[in-house]
């Protein structure tokens, strides 16, 4: 959620306020999408997962949670407040959750329409159009063998047809939108559309043919899989030996890292490849639709994500606060009309730069509240350097760790509450040799810490008074 809110606002989490999952971006927050909408010439739309508001239930320690438009629990569907525009989005069709554990009225209504169109799609799940929404969602969510040993690895073999899976929901709605736009169904001359897939994310649940598309015995484990963390920070050592609760990981839903076998890891990786391949195919169909409907030549296309997955790196899976490269080094592909093609750029950049880049491409002014940098210079010349360093904020409420990370061309430094990481990315790209405790690197550590503290101070919220004195 923090990085998704950063992509919309162009602000750091400590500024826009969504510092961890389970915190809503407040309605009325300024976003770059608002700017495009208010220009009067853009229709703005999103299909899929947005996660600017939480989709958890009112339960346990969160009994007083506010209602969210993105709630994924059927018993609350009748109470959901509908905001329009939604953070600047004219048109929204949502799906919340991950894998087979997806829900939302928009998704369930689409499933019912697909089953009505082709009744055979409902047969594997015994879905009937007369079923209440809650029952349909339950059938989608638990269409699996609960005794399957793969479940302990967050790998799910289920009965949901490819045609009803969340990836298809996002793809089909995006293509339908492009068709409508090309036919003149909207009054605006331009569009912005988010095609946002819930996958890839655990539980890894590739549907149909995608489940067996990659065989575990044919995949390889990461080079860092055998890292025993003797040279890691105390925080990482503890997770390796006991599996502490972190974002996306807790005891009982996954093996302790030190106990993982190569066979286990290959099963998880193979399943993750399956969901990624389905997304690859879906993206290909969306790009084909752009061409088919005559929109390709004048459309900017950006492919990126909100975070990576550790995927077995250093024997860890899922998310942080383990700021290894597999988690933080994410894809960013961009195609612009008549732009340079098939080129790589080595300049540092981050998600916070996306909204300013889009606004500049659209010829819109960049507001003062944004804190990133436009990437237009590297789109004109891949040799350009836009940034010399990147700041990453990650607050982990499970362990009360507020990590701050600075990335430079050569170094990664991460500060925890009472320890840290220091890696030379040029000489140790696999991040196996933590230099934080090596006194011979104190000088560079202090230099990087000063840069980190200076940058953190510079981007922090302005001090505001309620009254003059």
PLM segments and residue spans:
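Formylglycine-dependent sulfatase
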Residues: 1-412, 420, 429-433, 437-450, ...
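A short, conserved beta-to-alpha structural element at the edge of catalytic cores
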Residues: 331, 452-460
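Conserved, charged catalytic cores of large soluble enzymes
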Residues: 423
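Residues forming the ATP-binding cleft of Hanks-type serine/threonine protein kinase domains
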Residues: 426
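Short, charged, surface-exposed hinge/linker loops at domain edges
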Residues: 461-469
